[in-house]
Amino acid sequence: MIDAIYVQERTDETDAQCKAAKEAWDALTDAQKELVSGENADPDYFGRDTGDASKDDPLNQDDIGENELLVVSFGTSFNDSRATDIGGIEKALQEANPDWSVRRAFTAQIIINHIQARDDEKIDNMDQALERAVDNGVKNLVVQPTHLMHGAEYDELVEAIEKYQDKFETVRIAEPLLGEVGSDATVINEDKAAVAEAITAEAVKLAGYDSMDAAAEDGTAFVFMGHGTSHTANVTYDQMQTQLEKLNYKNAFVGTVEGEPEDTACEAVIEKVKEAGYKKVILRPLMVVAGDHANNDMAGDDEDSWKSQFEASKAFDSVDTQIEGLGRIKAVQDIYVAHTKAALEAEPLATAGGSNSSAALEDGTYTVDFNTDSTMFHVNEAKEGKAELTVKDGKMTAHITLPSKNIVNLFVGTAADAQKDGAKLLDPTTDTVEYLSLIHISEP
């Protein structure tokens, strides 16, 4: 039954399946619960204590009013982290925007189902949240992602909003935590600097030091573990390493659980810390939420956890962990507040009744951003992620320059659509396509 709800798609049967799975679990004896198994099932699914779910507000109420601020997160089934990390951001945004109703959406249906089945807490997915907004007569919608970067999840969020944007008078999408990605590892910005300063300040305080320098003098290194991604935005982690070095935090190291390049893998980070001569290590997540990855991949007891791997190297006198997400840090919450403020002050996206449509653009040539979702990196690096947009007689044509003629299997659209039967792959040197999408003008 757990396997049946461990899926990313919600169906008409989901509610009944969640209820049935919990009833079946409750009917087992303690001894039987320890024997639960399946492709995605184990005793921890229902049995692990992750905190009091009643302390978390799912923010799925109606009576929204005309102005909604929808806070979109990947989500976590760890109750304490959900209430503290995600809830902390939501509360900060509500306090800063009293004339707007803050509501929540998660993008991970697997997590939504887990929480519903175990705790009977119902959290909206993107479609449910947007339908709720439409049904409540929302006119002005601002979407604030809690995502770390402009990765695949952010792209999927934008795609979901595209389907509903003509239902509102104005729609705005705010920046994720670390802002624009940039073209290579050297590109940093104010958001990355603010996050680097915030996370190191919290890390040294919790470790009992006055500063990063004091920790370094004591032989302590801080390793910040990110998720990682196959998206081109993975370069963000190298940019964070660059930012930490720019701040002269020589005892700060960034690694990732997944994705490339290999120099951010656990084994590579262990070697870097060892070569730098530090004998004490403190692991901390570079993640908005301290959920499954922080508790298991970083701090778990399994031999492949980062804590276990650092200990197994025999290179360090101590290896400790700090299981705290970025979302609970006030300085980080302030960044989200600033991003929402900037979105409110910016031009809205094009809507059916809005004035910010392609026809509103004067004829001419513009520079626009474009994103790629690929197992290859830097597909859009030829001109730092920029394309040339020509507007003539209300029609738009984008010319995209690729870094190499050898790049193949291109598809204009989403990664999900590219995998569908009949998806047409392009010859980048000759093919032209028509595709309706959100276009963000970066400079005229």
Language model features by range: what are they?
Residues 408-418:
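Short, surface-exposed beta-strand/strand-loop-strand elements in extracellular ectodomains
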Residues 416-435:
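Solvent-exposed beta-strand/loop surfaces of large extracellular or lumenal domains
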Residues 1-49:
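Beta-rich interaction/scaffold domains
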Residues 403-407:
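Short proline/glycine-enriched turn/loop motifs at strand-loop junctions of beta-rich domains
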Residues 379-384, 388-398, 402:
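Short, surface-exposed binding/anchoring microloops in extracellular/periplasmic proteins
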Residues 439-444:
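Residue-level detector of conserved catalytic or cofactor/ligand-binding positions
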Residues 45-282, 287-355:
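Extended amphipathic ligand-handling, pore-lining, and cofactor/metal-binding catalytic surfaces
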Residues 357-387:
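Transition segment at domain starts
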